[in-house]
């Protein structure tokens, strides 16, 4: 498993990663590698807790980050730096031949991800997702823009190191390096750099610029919440969101 955590001035992604790694160990019993720009903070702030990681890889900070609005429930928000480009380089950074990459806020509560290692496809990613609420109608997770290409969640991916996935991640890196061009070509108006968009574009290209079957689905079901929601409690296998 690979977790990527880069702190900004208010959000402690390292602490999220530590919590996530503990759940991964409990439910999946897999080694966990942390990739981070915030290595010094990890060493100074989490001297003992960092031992939950089997390996820590320090990477140089990216100076070309965008910013976004972070919300903490309905009433509190901050405009903060969004350091999320490291995922585009994960093929070269992972120490594993078979890798699951998770966002640090993905809550692992069962062993369904182990099925990734017992199937034949070399690249898996979620396309279909479900809101934990029953009242929201969120269209942005259907396509990257209205009437645009299909949306895929870079939140959670699995890949094996093969010639095909090497080509895919080379394309990911190319799109990242030329993001302004692809953003314009695919009519993306958001000022936020999103890995979801990059992965969705790359999948569209490898499918021959049409819908196709290059990307197979991760096992299980992906549920999501909004940052306007509030997590009331979370224990071993139950959570409550308001």
Predicted regions and their residues:
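Glycosyltransferase catalytic domains, chiefly GT-A lineage
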Residues: 1-242
